[in-house]
């Protein structure tokens, strides 16, 4: 792509440049839409695409039928049933500056005789979907595909809790929106994938797309996908005739909509909305990559119509990527509790998207080799999906002459055992079951706040316990003595007694904390709680088969298979027996208060949002569930109470729009104090 002003080009020069850009864009689009594995950053694709649009606009005679500008999205997977969109699912035109946005506004108002407002909405970074209802019943769901033909993913969409199976009114209607993966779910998924030796997803959008297009619905069910619906194929079944009203009516029907929208009377209002959410984007629980500006009047939308690819009544303002330069000081290899060995770039600290970054995962050896990152390199750094620090590339002009290609280690940096590639894994793995680093990481997890919550038992102390051969597994913690702890660095009588007290107190934890602490693959804190509540004690769970476990609400087949595999291991049986012998509780006790008494929370659906100051989110959740509440992750008309901490965002706005009662943390604390 050249930087020559288009007005200086001849037709021949424009045609030649466009011919160079088209195959590159088509290949990038195939990787993005079909393989869910983008090879370039969105900003790079957007800029090249914008250049091609500008060329073809200035020289219409060079447009070809196979140009990416004449297509919507990508093609569909060959192994999923096809769905024809009677009304095409169009993509949006892009602008990258307020000047371009003003040009769009002037052009649109020049074609409309009467004044009109815009509706501004967040551009969710996910996968476009369409949901078809007949007489209020969900009958089919599909992806956008190429805009004309998508994939039938009905079975997978039925696993997503935010998609209603029955509407509040018996409408026949097609509703469109975005399926996305929340940031927290994305981080947890990538942690599980890396621990399993699988390549991590590049960003939440690709994670959502890969999860939604699975042939196994159990995979989709385990991925914690969510949706925001924002459009309909035909608005006639609705009572509203505005875009803002459409969002409200969809919420009344039972859909999850994004309550952060704002009606804008002019470009000043639009610019203010952009400024607000460009500043807040990193604080949101989901990824956004821009703002969508739509004519608010639905009949006006219909009269303006669309080009072959984009509607004339809407535009997407794309946020510029925040990218900084820093220098790689070292490449460090760490061993996780499952043996996966991960390279991490240690960098000169640099401010990026609201935080100081000094480390960035290089994921696995293949990634490191492909990026060709070397010690001493100056690199471009950004946050993938506004979350994870990620190196885009090295700066070739600044590479030191002495920088050499990095040599991948062949032995474990902890125990010296040979590192291996297991089948179908991109990760290097240490398979020594007695590797000190793996055992230490497992113990750190066991002691963590959401697991056994052993205050004072941090990584440095765990490392010393292993170095001095005081522990071999987590059961040994319960046999430690004061004299043994006094041999550790910086330990006195008081600190030793405090740690022993914390360890002793953890014996009485409810079963779900122990299950989570054991580090069973795919079993997070929520799944552990469901398992413990359903089976009641460890022996019953260990005796259960996959069918019995997967029958539990919120526990899918993948988790069930993982639990059965874990407890089939004789070493696990020995560990559980050791834990039981030292007095660790093996029964579910968290549910006792809720079953024996009632409270103002009994039977209530409660949502937590924002940052709590005195409590942790798990502590608040556990207390609420003990007192009869069901804690959910999204606000709807069925929500009975929202508890809002600091920096509460879209959930608070939606709760207020639905007249859901809102408490602050102090009110929750007061309720907790009353029950003591």
Swiss-Prot record:
Its EC number is 6.5.1.2. One of its GO terms (cellular component) is cytosol. Its cofactor is Mg(2+); Mn(2+). It comes from the Bacteria. It holds the Pfam family BRCT. Keywords: DNA damage, DNA repair, DNA replication, Ligase, Magnesium, Manganese, Metal-binding, NAD, Zinc. It catalyses: NAD(+) + (deoxyribonucleotide)n-3'-hydroxyl + 5'-phospho-(deoxyribonucleotide)m = (deoxyribonucleotide)n+m + AMP + beta-nicotinamide D-nucleotide. It is an enzyme of class 6 (ligase). InterPro entries: BRCT_dom, BRCT_dom_sf, DisA/LigA_HHH, DNA_ligase, DNA_ligase_AS, DNA_ligase_CS, DNAligase_adenylation, DNAligase_N. DNA ligase that catalyzes the formation of phosphodiester linkages between 5'-phosphoryl and 3'-hydroxyl groups in double-stranded DNA using NAD as a coenzyme and as the energy source for the reaction. It is essential for DNA replication and repair of damaged DNA. Belongs to the NAD-dependent DNA ligase family. LigA subfamily. This is DNA ligase. The lineage of its organism: Bacteria, Bacillati, Bacillota, Bacilli, Lactobacillales. The gene is ligA.
């Amino acid at each position: 792509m050249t930087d020559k002003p288009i007005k200086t080009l001849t037709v021949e020069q424009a045609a030649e440049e466009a011919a160079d850009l088209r195959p590159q864009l088509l290949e990038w689009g195939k990787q993005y839409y079909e393989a869910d594995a983008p090879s370039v950053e969105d900003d790079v694709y957007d800029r090249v695409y914008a250049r091609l649009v500008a060329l073809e606009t200035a020289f219409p005679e060079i447009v070809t039928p196979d140009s990416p500008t004449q297509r919507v999205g990508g093609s569909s997977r060959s192994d999923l049933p096809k769905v024809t969109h009677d009304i095409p699912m169009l993509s949006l035109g892009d602008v990258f500056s307020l000047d371009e946005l003003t040009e769009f506004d002037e052009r649109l108002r020049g074609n409309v005789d009467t004044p009109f407002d815009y509706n501004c909405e967040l551009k969710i970074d996910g996968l476009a979907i369409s949901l078809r209802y007949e007489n209020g019943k969900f009958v089919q769901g599909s992806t956008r595909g190429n805009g004309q033909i998508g994939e039938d993913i009905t079975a997978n969409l039925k696993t997503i809790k935010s998609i209603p199976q029955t509407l509040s009114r018996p409408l026949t209607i097609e509703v469109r929106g975005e399926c996305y993966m929340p940031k927290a779910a994305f981080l947890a998924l990538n942690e599980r994938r890396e621990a399993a030796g699988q390549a991590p997803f590049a960003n939440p959008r690709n994670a959502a797309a890969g999860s939604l297009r699975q042939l196994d619905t159990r995979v989709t069910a385990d991925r914690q996908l969510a949706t925001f619906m924002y459009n309909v194929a035909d608005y006639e079944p609705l009572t509203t005739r505005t875009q803002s009203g459409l969002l409200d009516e969809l919420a009344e029907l039972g859909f999850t909509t994004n309550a952060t929208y704002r009606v804008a009377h002019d470009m000043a209002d639009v610019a203010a909305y952009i400024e607000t959410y460009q500043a807040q984007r990193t604080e949101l629980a989901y990824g956004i990559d821009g703002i969508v500006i739509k004519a608010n009047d639905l009949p006006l939308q219909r009269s303006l119509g669309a080009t072959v690819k984009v509607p004339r009544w809407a535009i997407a303002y794309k946020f510029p990527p925040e990218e900084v330069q820093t220098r790689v000081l070292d490449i460090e290899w760490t061993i996780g509790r499952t043996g996966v060995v991960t390279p991490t770039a240690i960098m000169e600290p640099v401010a990026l998207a609201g935080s100081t970054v000094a480390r960035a995962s290089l994921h696995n050896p293949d990634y490191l080799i492909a990026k060709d990152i070397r010690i001493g390199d100056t690199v471009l750094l950004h946050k993938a999906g506004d979350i994870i620090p990620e190196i885009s590339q090295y700066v070739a002009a600044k590479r030191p002459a002495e920088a050499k290609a990095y040599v991948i280690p062949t032995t474990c940096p902890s125990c010296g055992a040979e590192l291996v590639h297991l089948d179908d894994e991109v990760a290097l793995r240490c398979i020594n079951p007695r590797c000190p680093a793996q055992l230490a990481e497992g113990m750190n997890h066991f002691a963590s706040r959401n697991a056994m919550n052993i205050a004072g038992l941090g990584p440095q102390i765990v490392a010393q316990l292993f170095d001095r051969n005081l522990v071999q597994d987590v059961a040994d913690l319960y046999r430690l003595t004061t004299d043994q702890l006094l041999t550790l660095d910086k330990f006195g009588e008081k600190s030793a007694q405090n740690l022993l007290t914390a360890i002793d107190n953890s014996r009485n934890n409810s079963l779900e904390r122990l299950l989570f602490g054991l580090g069973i693959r795919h079993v997070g804190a929520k799944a552990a709680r469901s398992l413990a509540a359903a089976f009641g004690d460890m022996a019953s769970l260990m005796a259960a088969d996959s069918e019995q476990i997967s029958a539990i609400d919120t526990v899918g087949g993948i988790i069930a298979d993982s639990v059965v595999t874990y407890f089939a291991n004789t070493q696990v049986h020995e560990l559980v027996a050791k834990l039981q012998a030292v007095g660790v509780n093996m029964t579910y006790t968290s549910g006792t208060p809720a079953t024996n008494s009632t409270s103002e929370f009994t039977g209530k659906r409660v949502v937590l949002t924002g940052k709590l100051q005195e409590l942790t989110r798990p502590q608040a959740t556990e207390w609420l569930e003990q007192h009869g509440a069901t804690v959910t992750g999204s606000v709807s008309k069925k929500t009975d109470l929202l508890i809002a901490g600091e920096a509460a965002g879209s959930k608070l706005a939606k709760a207020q729009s639905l007249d859901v009662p809102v408490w602050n943390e102090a009110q929750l604390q007061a309720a907790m104090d009353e029950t003591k």
